[in-house]
Amino acid sequence: MAMAITAKMVAELRAKTDAPMMECKKALTEAEGDFEKAEELLRVKLGSKAGKAASRVTAEGVVTLARDGDDVALVEINCETDFVTKNDSFLAFANAVAEGVVKNNPADLAALGAMPLAMDSFGPTVEDVRRGLIGKIGENMTVRRFKRFASGKAASYLHGTRIGVVVEFEGDEAAAKDVAMHVAAMKPVALSSADVPAELVAKERSVAAAKAAEDASVAQAAGKPVQSAEIVAKRIEGGVQKYLKEVSLNNQTFVKNDKQTVEQMLKEKATVIKSFTLYIVGEGIEKKVDDFAAEVAAQVAAAKGA
């Protein structure tokens, strides 16, 4: 029996992809309710727009940085609503955690929670303060992830409280800071094409192949000539190579000068980027979508039964 596709499911997929409602319903029906498969089907039918929109995240929180000499800490702390991200106690907690990470070098989240901290009459550990603030503010909050950099030169950039970047480098500090800003703006996934994770390359190749097959089917139905297998293969490979250039830092067009790539700019500045780390608030976290209509209906039903 085919899975029933509800209006709520269609609305959730549309919110993630920006695709038309009817296309979302068709994709969910074809995917038998599988959201990930439906997203890929939309990418095949609608191109990269759906894929780009699907990368947007909605979970709340802050990303913050702390420095101690040459050492740097990058931390993400999540909460339930945007309102709390502006709360003074929450922000002070986030900054205190980052400072604790850069000074204490905890091995993992458990060790981070055990670090000494006292604030707002809570303590004596980070975990005690976290629990205390949950009670005080009335929202759940978690320390999601952190990274400490202590291997040498590190440039950093914060875009508000939602995006943080740390770049480890050798050479010119100003150039490295420009790269950190570039990473925040362009969001590469790897230093070079060769460093792009194999699973991402395979997924992109699969999408390109499915798009080519879809186009061939449309052409055949319209009585138009279908491209040869050789041309299709070149087209798929061309799409993959284009993707690799778009997501690898060295190959991206430099955000401050569209006449050169990041790699060309770095060569001019005699600078080498050893690694970069990008934190985006809520990246990969699904935010709960409230069904207000269902909630109101439930309240009405409860009132009638009272």
From Swiss-Prot:
Family matches, as CDD domains: UBA_EF-Ts (cd14275)
Highest taxon in the source lineage: Bacteria
Subcellular location per the Swiss-Prot or TrEMBL entry: Cytoplasm
Involved in Mg(2+) ion dislocation from EF-Tu: region residues: 81-84
The entry's keywords: Cytoplasm, Elongation factor, Protein biosynthesis
NCBIfam families (UniProt xref): tsf
Record function comment: Associates with the EF-Tu.GDP complex and induces the exchange of GDP to GTP. It remains bound to the aminoacyl-tRNA.EF-Tu.GTP complex up to the GTP hydrolysis stage on the ribosome.
Family: Belongs to the EF-Ts family.
Name of the protein in its database record: Elongation factor Ts
Gene behind this protein: tsf
